[in-house]
UniProtKB/Swiss-Prot annotation:
Protein name (record): Acyl carrier protein
Gene giving rise to this polypeptide: acpP
Domain Carrier span(s) in chain numbering: 1-76
Record PTM text: 4'-phosphopantetheine is transferred from CoA to a specific serine of apo-ACP by AcpS. This modification is essential for activity because fatty acids are bound in thioester linkage to the sulfhydryl of the prosthetic group.
GO cellular component, one term: cytosol
GO molecular function: acyl binding; acyl carrier activity
Protein's cellular compartments: Cytoplasm
Function: Carrier of the growing fatty acid chain in fatty acid biosynthesis.
Coiled coil: none
PANTHER family (UniProt xref): ACYL CARRIER PROTEIN, CARRIER DOMAIN-CONTAINING PROTEIN
Residues with PTM O-(pantetheine 4'-phosphoryl)serine: 36
Main location: cytoplasm
Protein family per UniProt: Belongs to the acyl carrier protein (ACP) family.
Keywords for this protein: Cytoplasm, Fatty acid biosynthesis, Fatty acid metabolism, Lipid biosynthesis, Lipid metabolism, Phosphopantetheine, Phosphoprotein
Length: 77
């Protein structure tokens, strides 16, 4: 499974949305109807899955699915 597929799968599971709604341009708040608790839980799940900590400052910048994918790619080097 690719990184993109892993991230999308986590988002579908954490936010309870349909996979067809999730693409790189999807905004967590505007398109996927996530609230702050949803986003906190999503960040925690991503940290656990990819074995690194996401700072609060970085987390605030992750507004779309694509933002998360790009961030993880950068962190993985």
């Amino acid at each position: 499974m690719s990184l993109e597929d892993d991230v999308k799968s986590i988002i579908v599971e954490q936010l309870g949305v349909d996979a067809s709604e999730v693409n790189e341009n999807s905004s967590f708040i505007e398109d996927l109807n996530a609230d702050s608790l949803d986003l906190t839980e999503l960040i925690m799940t991503l940290e656990e899955k990819f074995n690194f900590e996401i700072s609060e400052q970085d987390a605030e910048q992750l507004r779309t699915v694509g933002d998360v994918i790009t961030y993880i790619k950068t962190r993985q080097g």
